[in-house]
Amino acid sequence: IFLTLAGSTSAGGCMNLYSDLIKYNMVDAIVATGASIIDMDFFEALGFKHYQGSQFQDDTELRKNYIDRIYDTYIDEEELQACDQTICDVANSLEPKAYTSREFIKELGKFLKNNAKKKGSLIETAFDNNVPIFCPAFTDSSAGFGLVMHQEQNPNKHITIDSIRELRELTEIKVKSKQSGLLM
């Protein structure tokens, strides 16, 4: 069973449910957006918070106060930058080569095992239970900024995200399965 995630489900309070699905062996793999995995789950595992706001707030005013808005959810820009820096730091610690998002997210899970301020994130739970998380649009999130910083700091030896190899991995899982399903 593939669990698919999109949108602000962490800020909406659904990540505990998703973690339980992993703990009780009800999903075999996760396919998620970068926003769900990085901007929501990883961000909160670092000890940062999201705040309920309004989708009608003036973005210019929010920006003046260093507040980012994802529809009706607010994030402190300085905390988001700290999340970006952590992504960069994890990338800097890895062997320079191509990784799928699944492989990189597994490294984030390993990082969270020792460094999470909020235990029990989806990434950490998936890591603990050997459930792969795929994120086909991985850089369409705060992770993209962290990886740009990593590549700027390491122009000749850096990691990359190999989305083609990832698509092949996902396809192979589906082809090898006698039965499969999606939980959306």
Where are these regions (language model features)?
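Conserved catalytic alpha/beta core of Sir2/sirtuin-type deacylases, generalized to analogous enzyme cores
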Residues: 1-5, 10-183
